[in-house]
Structure formats: structure tokens, C-alpha cells
Amino acid sequence: MKPVFRNVLAGAVLVAVGAVAGPWIYINLVKQDAPEALTLEPAVTTTVAEAVAESVVETSVEAVAEVSAVDGQWVVAAESVVGYRAKEVIVAQKTEGVGRTSAVTGVLTIADEQVTGAEFTVDMTTLKSDSSRRDRQVNTRILDTATYPTATFVMNEPIELTAEALAGSDFTATVTGTLTLRGVTKDIDVTLIARLIGDVIEVNGSIELVFAEWSIPDPSLPGIVVEDRGQLEFLLRFTR
């Protein structure tokens, strides 16, 4: 084999190896793992909570006091988090893109053992991931946050609160509401888990988004393939 041809072949092999090894090294040795999905912290069971739950079920005088104490408006707290999660493949290496923000505002209203209203707004311009390149794509081509800077959700139907929920147990419900994202408005059903802990209400869940249904263009780029859907995750904390 002639030296010139051998050098060209060796160079081509190095380029090919680099194209495969580079993403593997980045994803497995350099890139931080995607954060875990947003979830409620494990509940702590106490005899006090059990006693309160029993009193609520029995509709005692103490139970009435507990129920009336939660009535009113609850406001989204600063530590609330909303974000996206999408599966990516970078040159045959699987990973996840995750971006989050705490720029969330909203209120939740409780009256007569029902959640009678809830809405929140997210400042989509503040979403941040572990990649500035991804953030630029999200803010421009993908979500066009200059044109659509916020996303909103408004609950459309009340939710009945069980005695256990009022006593502090985890409460699962399907909520019907209206989501507006990237200029598209749709009625959706969201399954969530909620918990009342003292003067804090926590609400956790996720919404599957098929990108085409929300006028979101294919997020893929040369060398990066993104699935055609992702998750809109949220962990909201409401306080007085």
C-alpha cells in the first residue's frame, strides 16, 4: 500500500472513530446525567396524621375545623418547578434533554372540600438545561419564546377532596383543564398526585406532548435525533 493512500486511509479511520467515540465520551464521561423526574418526597406517616384522618372520616368537630382551615386561595411558591424532558440519540448514544424553570406563578382555590379553581403561568423564556446550545434551540426554533413567552394551564372542573386528602395523605386525581403552549390551546386531562402538609400543598404530575400537535417543529438536529414527543413535568408548591 502506498504511503499516501495509507495515510489517507488512516486519517479516515481516525475521523470515523472520533465521530463515534466523541459522543460516547461526552455522554458517558463528560455530560452530567439528566435529573430524575420530578416527584413528591416520600410521605412520612405519623400517629398524629392517622388520628387526624380518623377524626375527619368521623366528621367530628375537630374535622370541621381542619376542613375550614384549608379554604381560601393558595399561591404558587418560589420553589415550584416546571420543565420538559425529551429523549435524544446522539450518534447512537441515548440520553435525555431536560430543561427546567422556577419562574412560575399561579393560584389554587379551595372551598367546601373542593378545589374550585386552579391556574398557573410559566415563563418559558427562563427554561435552562445543561446545554446552552439546546437552550438556544428551545428559545428560538422549538418554542419560539420571543413570540410565545408563557405557557398557561387553567383547571376547568372542580376536584372533590377526600377525607384522607384533607388529613394529609397522598391524593391522586385526574384534572380537566386548558393548556396553552406555543400559541396552541387545547383541553386536556392530567393525572396528578397532591399532598397537604401543614401550610403547604404539593402538586406533582406530567403531561405528554406530541410535538406536532402543539405546532412544535421537530427538535432534531444533524447528529441529534429527538423523539416526536416529550414530557412537560411539574412539581408545584402552594402556600398561603
How would you describe each model-predicted region?
Residues 2-240:
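Low-complexity, acidic/polar, glycine-enriched regions of mature
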